[in-house]
Amino acid sequence: MQKDQLMQWEIEGELEAGIPLVPQISLLKKYIAEGNDIVLISDMYLPKEVIVKLLQKADPLLATLPLYVSSEVGHQKTTRKLFLHVYSDLDYCYEKWIHIGDNRFADQVQPEMLGIQTAPIPVPEWTPYEKRLADYSSHYEFRCVARQIQSFRLTHPAPEEQFAYCYAALYLVPYV
């Protein structure tokens, strides 16, 4: 019972705090517009239905793409077996396979060992301010706020907007 409640809270937290990665979504849409087939592959412990909800929240198009999740398939990218499962399940007949991801080992080293071309996505660094905010408290909410600030900063380059959203707004919250 307690385990089920903890899992439910974890799922609710993920669904509430999930922030779309706009540059990556734009890249996927570009590839789709160019006529490429897109398959989503995830090493994730959450059930596939939860991942689909997160994708739907980020962009409805993402929820329509084929999705392979390690928790459902029983294989992981880190062991290369998830890639092999996708290969056999898709009746693969492509000239090349390009895998895009942000984890050096799971998304670059392992697929390259199978001859899959990789395109690493750099993980955005925290600014010192974002890092201090995320580490400020043991409360999960602080990390969520830091992540939202980072996401805003990465998608809104105007310094005035960044200052207002990332710094000034937090000081005004207690007065609202």
Identify what each model region corresponds to:
Residues P60, Y68, E72-T78, F83-V86:
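Catalytic cores of eukaryotic secretory-pathway lumenal/extracellular enzymes that build
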Residues K3-Q56, P66-V69:
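Substrate-recognition element of Asp-dependent hydrolases with the DxDx(T/V) motif
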Residues M44-K48, V73-H75, R104-F105, P124-T127:
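Short, solvent-exposed loop/turn segments at secondary-structure junctions
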Residues E130, Y136-Y175:
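Flexible inter-domain linker/hinge segments
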Residues R80-F105:
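Conserved Lys-Pro-Asp/Glu-containing loop-to-beta segment of HAD-superfamily phosphomonoesterases
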Residues S71, D102, A119-E141:
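Catalytic or ion-translocation cores adjacent to nucleophile or general acid/base/metal-coordination motifs
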Residues L55-S71, Y136, A146-R147:
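Structural recognition of alpha->loop->beta junctions
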Residues D102-T118:
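Acidic, divalent-metal-coordinating active-site segment for phosphoryl/phosphodiester hydrolysis
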